Amino acid sequence: MLTRKQHELLTFIQTRLEDSGISPSFEEMKEALDLKSKSGVHRLISALEERGFIRRLPNRARALEVLRQPDSAVGKAAPVSQREAANTNSALPPLRAAPKAAPAPANDVIELPLHGKIAAGVPIEALETTATLPVPAALLGAGEHYALEVSGDSMVEAGIFDGDYALVRKTDVARDGEIVVALVRGEEATLKYLHREKGMVRLDPANAAYDPQYYRPEEVAVQGKLAGLLRRYH
């Protein structure tokens, strides 16, 4: 049996993994659970790991795997994602849940449109191209997808590196804390964490060397959210 906070954290991690394939950062977990410090997150993670609900993947930053779900929990609260939605500024539309797709055969390959480069640093223009990228269908869920090549290092703490291919599910809505492709002022595209703050849109990097970027809601259009990553080793 888990405590309320342990159950909330486990649910939050599972939801983020299902949505983006990437574990949430300790900062995101701290904010989602309304904790005062990251040490509280560390204690919850350790407790879940000791009880066999999650495990940390070796040699990978921010890599958590959910092993099982609890049968019951103490003081079960509303899922964190619901609390986030309740606190979301209405300047941008809320997330619409996408249907779950049936698992694709492991040997199926889909040719995704490769729309040039996207910045993981200062925004750069998203280049259109007729190129495609072969992607295992098992990496993709429901919906329409496209690929962008990552340029820059501002998302390295999220495990996204220069030269990676971002696999993006087309959508114009997203929750706070999700990694999105944001079109800024109709000209530049960037890959960042999305947050809404005091009537503004904040695009957060995952690199302490970069500062958050603030824009008016009408200056930012969500064009997709991160569904996965593809990395080539040469």
From Swiss-Prot:
Keyword Protein biosynthesis: no
CDD domains named in the record: S24_LexA-like (cd06529)
Enzyme class name: hydrolase
Transmembrane region(s): none
DNA-binding region extent: 26-46
GO terms, biological process: DNA repair; DNA replication; negative regulation of DNA-templated transcription; proteolysis; SOS response
GO molecular function annotations of the record: DNA binding; serine-type endopeptidase activity
Gene3D superfamilies: Umud Fragment, subunit A (2.10.109.10), Winged helix-like DNA-binding domain superfamily/Winged helix DNA-binding domain (1.10.10.10)
Location of region: Disordered: 73-100
EC number: 3.4.21.88
SUPFAM superfamilies: LexA/Signal peptidase, Winged helix' DNA-binding domain
Keywords of the record: Autocatalytic cleavage, DNA damage, DNA repair, DNA replication, DNA-binding, Hydrolase, Repressor, SOS response, Transcription, Transcription regulation
Keyword Transcription regulation found: yes
Catalyzed reactions: Hydrolysis of Ala-|-Gly bond in repressor LexA
Residues forming the catalytic site: 154, 192
Annotated site, Cleavage, chain positions: 120-121
NCBIfam families in the record: lexA
Protein name: LexA repressor
